[in-house]
Each structure stands twice: as structure tokens, then as C-alpha cells.
């Protein structure tokens, strides 16, 4: 924390104590992290909305004012709560670390199975971005204009 030089760099202190030592241990560690200078606190593996509420209340009661961050990882012990629900519980940010990846990989798996079975992607077109949507997302035109006319020649000498 003391070595932090960039004001835009945020140190989010994570505690996994809840799963092993209980909620009170997680609160104690989080308070220590805040006192050491953490910019935000991230309690991992809380098991109910009530635990999230209690954690936030206990942190605040002990004078800690840094933002709280929640983690929404599917198929774990944490219930699937919405961003609005977390906000009502006292959390200022929510991480969805593998939601998009899991969704994309399942779609890829299904597409490949259908390609193997039917040999065509025709029935998947409505699931796909158009070429223009992809270019817009990647800001292709900006990159093309920036690099147009520039070439790189590699020499084996």
C-alpha cells in the first residue's frame, strides 16, 4: 500500500476468512486492511444477503468508510444478487469475473457441436454480431486510419 504511486491505481483488499474462520474474522481482517490503507474491501464467499448486510454494518460500525466490493461468481456459495440488491446492502461495486467467459464458452461449445452435426452455421446467424457491429466494437476504422500506410519490413540479416 505504501509503495502505491499512481492515484488512479486502486488497491482492493480481499479476505477469504469467512470460509475458514467465520464472518467476524473476515470483518476483523477487512478493518485491518482498511487501516493499512486499502482503497476498497472485498469479502469473499459470504453466503447470504444477510451476511453481506452484516459485514457492511460491522465495517461501518468500526469506522471504516472505504467502498465495499462484492463478487458474483456463479455456482459458488454466494447467492446470485443483483447490482441494485448489493447497492441496498451497502456495496459500491460488483465483480462478475467469469460470467461473460462462461456464457461465451457455452455458446462456443454449442456452436461447435452443431457445426459438427449439421456442417453449417446458418442457424446461428441471429446470435452473431454483424461484420459492422464487430468493426464498431473493435473501433476498426480508428485503428485502420491510424496505421494505414505504415508497414513493417522484417529482415533476416
Predicted regions and their residues:
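Flexible C-terminal active-site loop/helix
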Residues: 115-157
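Alpha/beta enzyme core
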Residues: 1-96, 102, 106-113, 144, ...
Amino acid at each position: 500500500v505504501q509503495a502505491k504511486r499512481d492515484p488512479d491505481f486502486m488497491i482492493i483488499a480481499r479476505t477469504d476468512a469467512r470460509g475458514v474462520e467465520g464472518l467476524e474474522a473476515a470483518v476483523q481482517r477487512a478493518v485491518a486492511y482498511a487501516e493499512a490503507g486499502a482503497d476498497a474491501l472485498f469479502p469473499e464467499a459470504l453466503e447470504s444477503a444477510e451476511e453481506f448486510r452484516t459485514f457492511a454494518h460491522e465495517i461501518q460500525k468500526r469506522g471504516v468508510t472505504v467502498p465495499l466490493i462484492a463478487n458474483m461468481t456463479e455456482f459458488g456459495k454466494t447467492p446470485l444478487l443483483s447490482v441494485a440488491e448489493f447497492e441496498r446492502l451497502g456495496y459500491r461495486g460488483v465483480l462478475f469475473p467469469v460470467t461473460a467467459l462462461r456464457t461465451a464458452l457455452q455458446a462456443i461449445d454449442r456452436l461447435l457441436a452443431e457445426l459438427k452435426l449439421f456442417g453449417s452455421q446458418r442457424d446461428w446467424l441471429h446470435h452473431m454480431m454483424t461484420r459492422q457491429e464487430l468493426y464498431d466494437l473493435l473501433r476498426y476504422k480508428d485503428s485502420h486510419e491510424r496505421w494505414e500506410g505504415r508497414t513493417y519490413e522484417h529482415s533476416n540479416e
